[in-house]
């Protein structure tokens, strides 16, 4: 991969080793609800699956996120993006994530694991005060039920495990018998969800 798309050539060997070690540690002992994907040819391109936290509008979803390390990482923070579409105050239309940990609160000793856990926490406690999606931020503050319904609908449409590739909790057997065993059941559940979504969409259109 050329340096036009990657900063791997600009990172020190020590930084590359440190990042790779942390990723391998996370693969061996994954944080709850997070599955990291290792790209051994380019450690500056880090992707992970994050399970939507229980008790939130994102609970049924699995979200793919991407971290892009800057050329002087860890002195400057990486950029973080949701690759899965999501309705959230702190996520821009291009997927960019706004969180203080990756801005003013960044410290060079914060690792990849801390960043991914922070993103997961953002799904639990959004920050409408620093909204990149103003509509979502305003809706969260003024009409939470509508916000929750919209976020849940987007999650059910875009963040299903089959669309994202795999769930974080499926780290051990993405292609094993467990996946095949649940495929039929997942299809039935998704068909039911589609019916429910169509009804919800019709209701929302009537209210517009």
UniProtKB/Swiss-Prot annotation:
**Which keywords does UniProt give here?**
ATP-binding, Cell cycle, Cell division, Nucleotide-binding, Transferase, Ubl conjugation pathway
User: Is Iron-sulfur included in the keywords of this UniProt record?
Assistant: no
Q: In which pathway does it act?
A: Protein modification; protein ubiquitination
Q: What EC number(s) does its UniProt record assign?
A: 2.3.2.23
The record ties this protein, via Pfam families, to: UQ_con (PF00179)
Q: Which CDD domains match?
A: UBCc_UBE2S
What residues form the catalytic site here?
A: 98
Function as written in the Swiss-Prot or TrEMBL entry: Catalyzes the covalent attachment of ubiquitin to other proteins. Acts as an essential factor of the anaphase promoting complex/cyclosome (APC/C), a cell cycle-regulated ubiquitin ligase that controls progression through mitosis. Acts by specifically elongating polyubiquitin chains initiated by the E2 enzyme vih/UbcH10 on APC/C substrates, enhancing the degradation of APC/C substrates by the proteasome and promoting mitotic exit.
Record protein name field? Ubiquitin-conjugating enzyme E2 S
């Amino acid at each position: 991969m050329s340096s036009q798309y990657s900063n791997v050539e600009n990172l020190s060997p020590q930084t590359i080793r440190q990042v790779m070690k942390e990723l391998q540690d996370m693969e061996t002992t994954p944080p709850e609800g997070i599955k990291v994907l290792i790209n051994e040819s380019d450690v500056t391109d880090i992707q992970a699956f994050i399970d939507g936290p229980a008790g939130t509008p994102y609970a049924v979803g699995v979200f793919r996120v991407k971290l892009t390390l800057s050329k002087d990482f860890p002195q400057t923070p990486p950029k973080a993006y949701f690759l899965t579409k999501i309705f959230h105050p702190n996520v821009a239309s291009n997927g960019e994530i706004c969180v203080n940990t990756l801005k003013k609160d960044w410290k060079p000793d914060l690792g990849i694991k801390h960043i991914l856990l922070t993103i997961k926490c953002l799904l639990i406690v959004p920050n409408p005060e620093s909204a990149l999606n103003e509509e979502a931020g305003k809706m969260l503050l003024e009409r939470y039920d509508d916000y929750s319904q919209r976020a849940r609908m987007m999650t059910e449409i875009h963040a299903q495990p089959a669309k994202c590739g795999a769930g974080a909790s499926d780290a051990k057997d993405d292609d094993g018998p467990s996946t095949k065993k649940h495929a039929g059941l997942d299809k039935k559940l998704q068909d039911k969800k589609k019916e429910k979504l169509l009804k919800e969409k019709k209701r929302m259109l009537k209210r517009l």
